[in-house]
From Swiss-Prot:
Source species of the chain: Persephonella marina (strain DSM 14350 / EX-H1)
PANTHER family listed in its UniProt record: 3-DEHYDROQUINATE SYNTHASE, PTHR33563
UniProt-recorded name of the protein: 3-dehydroquinate synthase homolog
InterPro entries referenced in this protein's UniProt entry, alphabetically: DHQ_synth (IPR002812)
This protein's UniProt keywords: Amino-acid biosynthesis, Aromatic amino acid biosynthesis, NAD, Oxidoreductase
The protein's Enzyme Commission number: 1.4.1.-
Record-stated family: Belongs to the archaeal-type DHQ synthase family.
Oxidoreductase in keyword set: yes
Tree of life domain: Bacteria
Pfam families: DHQS
Entry's Gene Ontology BP terms: amino acid biosynthetic process; aromatic amino acid family biosynthetic process
GO MF annotations in UniProt: 3-dehydroquinate synthase activity; NAD binding; oxidoreductase activity, acting on the CH-NH2 group of donors, NAD or NADP as acceptor
Length: 331
């Protein structure tokens, strides 16, 4: 997930409080206000001394010319967290810096600039630094940074097999967020081919809805987490983040509140898209739903061969959850 920093160097209690309530990752404050600020909430503070030096390896570089840009690049490569300040905010210096290092932060004035910064060269800056006196602008930028963090292209795959595979351990992922209708998690036996499993937002004759939950499937399966990485479902636990996606492929990070592993009857679902195989092992229960090619919700007990379902495929393999270009065959 991108990092959100609020610059409160001109200390204002309301600014700091709003930043904390909006989920800021860091707040920049003057050193003489450190003790006062810490009483307002638990958050990471970057302390600025009277000369403007920052703690936690952060450094501000004002870009006026090519030499300044080269200085920023060198500092970032040396491990410094470089906050880029431009006299005339443009994309080009950030493009050049992002191409050379991941330790680049952009100083922004509003949500529009933040949205551009996090999307530059597709991967965007590591975070944004907002300086404003507008409390609502803090909330707007927080929404940009914390909500939609990834966009993937979902495909329509044709179901080729639905096979009962007996009992297995499955993971129900309870998050600290409420899912909307049309949202769920991407899971798969292989990270190269995943199926969109819908959240439990729908009412059922047998059980009440659980709109904070995705019954995600067997413990061995992959799911996506922020940063374009994958983890095994069994690795999810309270406090960790996982990606939620809607039917258009818009992703947002949500926090895991609890991961329940229980033994249940399971189904192997296999599908195909342009010769590529997607598969997942899901619980055999009426409340478990995948998403049809038209956006409809289909219970796994009603799923049939030939049905179209939404999924995701990628070419690269995975090494410790990171995408790599190498030959990997998973069956």
């Amino acid at each position: 997930m991108k990092e959100f920093i609020v610059n409160a160097i001109n200390y204002d209690k309301k600014i700091v409080t709003t930043a904390i309530e909006s989920g800021a990752d860091y707040i920049i404050i003057p050193e003489d206000k450190e003790e006062e600020a810490k009483k307002l909430g638990r958050v990471n503070f970057i302390i600025a001394d009277k000369k403007g030096n920052l703690t936690d390896d952060f450094v501000i570089v004002t870009i006026k010319n090519k030499q300044d840009e080269e200085k920023a690049a060198q500092l970032a490569k040396a491990g410094k967290k470089v906050i880029v300040r431009t006299t005339d905010w443009t994309i080009i210096p950030l493009e050049n810096l992002i191409a050379q290092s991941e330790n680049i932060y952009a100083e922004v004035k509003n949500a529009d600039e933040a949205s551009i910064a996090v999307g530059i060269l597709e991967k965007g800056v590591k975070g944004v630094v907002l300086e404003t006196e507008d409390l609502n602008e803090i909330k707007r930028v927080a929404s940009v940074i914390k909500e939609t963090t990834e966009k993937v292209e979902l495909i329509r795959a044709k179901v080729t097999a639905i096979i009962p595979v007996g009992m297995g351990d499955r993971v129900a992922v309870d998050t600290t967020s409420l899912f909307k209708r049309g949202e769920g998690m991407l899971v798969g036996n292989s990270s190269a081919g995943m199926i969109l499993v819908h959240a439990e937002t729908e009412e059922s004759p047998y059980v009440a809805s659980r709109p904070f939950r995705v019954n995600a499937g067997a413990v061995h399966m992959y799911t996506r987490v922020p940063g374009g990485k994958t983890v095994y479902l069994c690795e999810l636990e309270a406090g960790k983040e996982v990606m939620a996606y809607d039917i258009d492929g818009n992703g947002r990070a949500v926090v895991v509140g609890r991961a329940k592993i229980e033994r249940r009857p399971m189904l192997l679902i296999e599908a195909e898209y342009n010769g590529k195989k997607l598969s997942a092992v899901l619980q055999n229960a009426e409340t478990i739903r995948v998403v049809g090619g038209d956006g409809s919700l289909i219970s796994v007990v009603d799923l049939k061969e030939g049905d179209e379902i939404l999924g995701y495929v990628e070419e690269a393999g995975r090494h410790f959850g990171m995408k790599v270009e190498e030959t990997i065959l998973e069956k």
